[in-house]
Amino acid sequence: MAKPVRNPTEPLRTRHVFLDTEVYRRAAFNISNTPFALLAKQIEDGRVVLHTTDITLTEIHRQLKETAVAMAAEAKRLVRDFNRIAQLTGEDNVTVRDVDGSALGEKAWAGFVDVLVKRFRSHSVLALEVPARIVFDRYFDGRPPFDHRGSKEFPDAFIVEALARYCNSNEISMYVVSGDAALRKAAGEHDTLLPWRH
């Protein structure tokens, strides 16, 4: 059996990287998995600097909490359905510890932030401080991420603008990693941002 061939990789154009909420969501917010462990090693070795924004963190917090609440409700439903079937067999009902989905979500959030700060040494960019006028000008001009009719990409627009301002003020460039085409297109409008598809 032949060994798999690795495609050569190009060196990074910058060591600064921003991961969109979608990247974390796609990993089910498990930032201890193998790809994130590899990222942590790159950060530890000084090859990568991870950036996030206040908006991204708020989105992750909300989504983590929603996921935990949904999972707790699903667990209750599964136990109830299982016990209905078990009644037919004469088996005793299964008891499962009641899980407070909201509390679980908050604990998951605290763990997520702990890893993000301690292991990934993430730098936070304040997107909520971007003047709204800048984003609304893009919106009214129909520029990315608002180039599609009916687009509601306001959080992404603030994020991209904040990252571009951060890069300009620090004279750096930054990869913007996302599976969201509109966010990547908006990032591509700025010389300092390098869109990268996840």
Residue ranges of model-derived segments:
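Conserved SAM-binding loop
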Residues: V176
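Active-site-proximal, substrate-binding regions of enzyme catalytic domains
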Residues: A2-I172, A181-H198
